[in-house]
Amino acid sequence: MREAICIHIGQAGYQIGNACSQLFC
C-alpha cells in the first residue's frame, strides 16, 4: 500500500516522491 502511494506521489512530483521513498519505502 505504502509503495503504491510513493509511486503515485512520485508521478505528481519527483522531489516529494523521493522524500516519501526515504521516509516510507
Curated annotation (Swiss-Prot):
Query: Could you state one GO cellular component term attached to this entry?
Result: microtubule
User: Cross-referenced Gene3D superfamilies, in alphabetical order?
Assistant: Tubulin/FtsZ, GTPase domain (3.40.50.1440)
Keyword GTP-binding among UniProt keywords: yes
Quickly give the catalysed reaction.
Answer: GTP + H2O = GDP + phosphate + H(+)
What UniProt keywords apply to this chain's record, in alphabetical order? Cytoplasm, Cytoskeleton, GTP-binding, Hydrolase, Microtubule, Nucleotide-binding
Q: Could you tell me where this protein is found in the cell?
A: Cytoplasm, Cytoskeleton
InterPro entries xref list: Tubulin/FtsZ_GTPase_sf
Q: What EC number(s) would the UniProt record show?
A: 3.6.5.-
Annotated residues that bind GTP are located at Q11
- GO terms of molecular function: GTP binding; hydrolase activity
> What is the top EC class of this enzyme, as a single word?
hydrolase
Q: Which cofactor does it need?
A: Mg(2+)
Which SUPFAM superfamilies would you find in this protein's record? Answer: Tubulin nucleotide-binding domain-like
Source organism, top-level taxon: Eukaryota
* Functional description taken from the UniProt entry: Tubulin is the major constituent of microtubules, a cylinder consisting of laterally associated linear protofilaments composed of alpha- and beta-tubulin heterodimers. Microtubules grow by the addition of GTP-tubulin dimers to the microtubule end, where a stabilizing cap forms. Below the cap, tubulin dimers are in GDP-bound state, owing to GTPase activity of alpha-tubulin.
Task: Please describe the quaternary structure of this protein.
Answer: Dimer of alpha and beta chains. A typical microtubule is a hollow water-filled tube with an outer diameter of 25 nm and an inner diameter of 15 nM. Alpha-beta heterodimers associate head-to-tail to form protofilaments running lengthwise along the microtubule wall with the beta-tubulin subunit facing the microtubule plus end conferring a structural polarity. Microtubules usually have 13 protofilaments but different protofilament numbers can be found in some organisms and specialized cells.
Q: Which family does it belong to?
A: Belongs to the tubulin family.
| Name of the protein described by the UniProt record | Tubulin alpha chain
The organism that produces this protein has a lineage beginning with: Eukaryota, Discoba, Euglenozoa, Kinetoplastea, Metakinetoplastina
